[in-house]
Amino acid sequence: MKANLEHIALGTHQMKSSDEVVSNEGFIQYGSDNLFPQYLIGLYQSSPTHTALVTSIAQMVYGDGFMPHDLDSRLAFLSWDMADQLRKCCVDYKIQGGYALEIEWSLDRSTIANVSHLPFENLRACEVNDEEKVTHYKYSANWADSAVEAIDIHTFNPKYAKEFPTQVLYVKPFSPGSFYYPKPDYIGALNYVELEREIGIYHINNIHNGLSPSFSIHFKNGVPPIEERNAIRNEIESQMTGSKGAGKVWIT
């Protein structure tokens, strides 16, 4: 007699893609969904140990701060509030593995008028030119929303100050296996950072559900038709997979 057994897939972890993929618009997607930087920020905001480490290490990177020696540079540094801008860069550097600065040239294009921090997660590289150099970046305040138009920003180059008075200085260390984007130094620990987040979600859901255990039910009144079994299996998988399924009770 053939046993009627159904396999219930209660979830398999898939690592977030950080692949560099050429889009139809000519820029390089960061991850298969183009949201890997946003994923890193999500981990920073949801894993307490990771949050504490990133915050403290970013403070150590900043150290005692920065201050130019000559008077003119010091005045510009203070007027641009560069201390605060560089603090933000240090946080980006720790979370993302790189940082970016917006450079604005003066009206006569002879000097730099302002320097400010650009959120690293909002920038995407355009394809390299014949010299294998990135000359432009795309900036969008919300890459998850295709209705938000991305604007072009030229990479920092004083030779093109007249044509492009607003430029971006994109700083990224060498990352093995990557060309356009850096990787954070904790890239090998992402599973463990995510694990801490999921453990917290699992336990808080258990608390909200009165610490009641999740369990399965065996049908004693015969085997349902295949369509009904598939519907039951899909419902169980959707409701009980992952940390959000903790403590849920099924009644039949």
Where are the predicted features?
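Structured, contiguous alpha/beta core segments that scaffold functional sites
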Residues: 1-252
